[in-house]
């Protein structure tokens, strides 16, 4: 069994584009468009480099991050079936279905 802690999709995406030095476009909530490569990131900010210039961008100001190529080929979200979580059943387990107006208590 894999004992590594699950990494959230945001960290997985940002870390992949950082390691691969993939050019990205960041759109801020104000509508400003920034381009460059991620040098680093933490819980609250992203360090973007473009033309040897660094910009520290606070995550609360970011609306969208767009990569110039496909980054996440599989579903890397924590808690998704196939990644350490049990499969999600589209129907309730037997004996748990109730009809409208029916009480489930004893």
Curated annotation (Swiss-Prot):
Keyword RNA-binding on entry: yes
Gene3D superfamilies cross-referenced by the UniProt entry: 2.30.30.100
Annotated segments matching region Disordered: 72-106
Biological processes, Gene Ontology terms: regulation of DNA-templated transcription; regulation of RNA stability; regulation of translation, ncRNA-mediated
Residues in Sm domain copies: 11-71
Record-linked InterPro entries: Hfq, LSM_dom_sf, Sm
Gene Ontology cellular-component annotations: cytosol
Alphabetized CDD domains for the sequence: Hfq
GO molecular function, one term: RNA binding
Residue ranges with Polar residues bias: 96-106
UniProt keyword list: RNA-binding, Stress response
Family per record: Belongs to the Hfq family.
Subunit structure: Homohexamer.
Function field: RNA chaperone that binds small regulatory RNA (sRNAs) and mRNAs to facilitate mRNA translational regulation in response to envelope stress, environmental stress and changes in metabolite concentrations. Also binds with high specificity to tRNAs.
Protein name: RNA-binding protein Hfq
Encoding gene (name): hfq
